[in-house]
Amino acid sequence: MHVGNDVVDLRDPSNQPDAIHPRFDARAFTASELRELCGSASPHRRRWTLWAAKESTYKAAKKLDPTVRFFPREFVVEGLDEEGAEVHHSAGRFIVRLRHCDEWVHAVATPRSRLGRRRSVITRSPWPGSAEVRSIERARGNPSEVARDLAMDSIASGMAVARKDVELEARGRIPEVRMRDAQLRVDLSLSHDGQYVAWAWAGTRHP
């Protein structure tokens, strides 16, 4: 399972309505998405939820097709609600699971199964791995490194393997998980914004 994730710090100064480019919305969103944004009771959160859905889908799509580039309007968000959305792109259809609070929004995207299950059923199903957000307000160091270390801790715990045996390599900008002895099929995505880091991984361990 290919996975992509994105976190947005809703309180970060650079993400506030008066800080973004005046044409940001027009460049990022389709006509239907703009109508939804204009009609939203919470346009600030709606804006960054749409964005996180697109960004997380891009990360998942890039793993399927390395030639995919991030042109936000080409990632079309449909059926957005509190729990998730479906995103359409030339690379395929993707299901996005959403979590949010007053401080952040977190999106996790995976390719849509051909089994035909409803999106609402998929987003409510148990996640085969871990998807978490952590504050780094008091942490020191590079947020990318913090996200990586926390994700590796999570993978080791979730897969019941020794933390020292979990290794992370980069293929381009895509993280890949390696093990010394055990065979793992793990797909990992990392993200950070403002005071938050996030990760999502899915996988299984072979006996």
Where does each model-flagged region fall?
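Core catalytic alpha/beta fold that binds nucleotide/phospho-ligands
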Residues: 1-207
